[in-house]
Amino acid sequence: MKTSIEYRDPLELSEELAKLGQLTKITQLEGGSGFYTMQAANTNKVALAEISANKTLLYEGWGNGITIDFNWITPKANTQGAFGYCDGFKMTKNSLAGFGTINSVPGNAWGKYNNECSSTGCMLEKQLLFELLENCKAYDGLERLTGDQGIYCNNKALNQLKRLAAREVSAGIQNPEKYFDLVIACLEEPMTEQNSQDPKHIDQLREIINLAHSEKTMESPLSLLEVCKYINTSQASLYRICQEYFGMGIIELMTQIRLEESRRIMLNQDARRKLKLYSIRDIAIKYGFKHQGRYARRYYTAFGELPSQT
């Protein structure tokens, strides 16, 4: 299945991912309309999704509690540095990440990818993967999977995994057992300083993402001081983290996410009725915008139309 969509906002992509059981919220971190392509394939034990976009996108809520969703990127250009982050793990051409989806709580993972790469998710049934790891005594792999966010692979297995997925995401999955074998081979690669990464800021980053999407705090126009208190960090540290990982400040990030969520609810008439959000003003207040005029201006800047035109 291949989907190509030119969009004004990334809600359509969320809907496509929902068909794979991923209730993922997506925020575009730069202005203007976008274009993305998505290819997907699945069998009983394995699902694949390859996404390419011309805008930087933030994904929140990935993971269904049943599968472990291994992620990697394929560069479109020879660029130095990170192409994005998966649960805070830096994504380069040798990265394999997404280990945080081992958590049984759905929607616990996040990722951010720029427009210079495509990202691929390989979703393997968790119970079967654990059985295979234990049966072949892959104890190093088990330790990495349960203790790390990702690894850098320098063996042939990751390249083979990428080639297999690139072929079968469009042609259909023919060798589901091969994905388990190759992932285990990646996890069992001997540990070196080159393929390990200190998980600095992992917990803080997850708190930032959770706070930005929290329905409990969505109605409150949080100040920078309140955000720092919630995350238990200094303004200087929070600024450095957000600039490094998101390319913007925390308030700007939260504002963009709230705009996306307000648009999501504005386009869903059933949800509006259930929440008793009968007017644009009701929706603006629900998502922390107390001044309707400012909300309308920010909405127009983000989506190219006024709330009344949606």
Where are the predicted features?
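Helix-turn-helix DNA-binding module
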Residues: 238
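Alpha-helical bundle regulatory/interaction domains
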Residues: 1-33, 70-72, 78-218, 223-225, ...
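A short acidic, glycine/proline-enriched capping/turn motif at secondary-structure boundaries
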Residues: 54-58, 75-80
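Alpha-helical DNA-contacting segments of helix-turn-helix folds
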Residues: 241, 245-261, 265-266, 294, ...
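Conserved short histidine dyad/triad with adjacent acidic residue
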Residues: 32-33, 38, 42, 46-65, ...
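Short polybasic/polar patches that bind polyanions
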Residues: 42, 229, 244, 285, ...
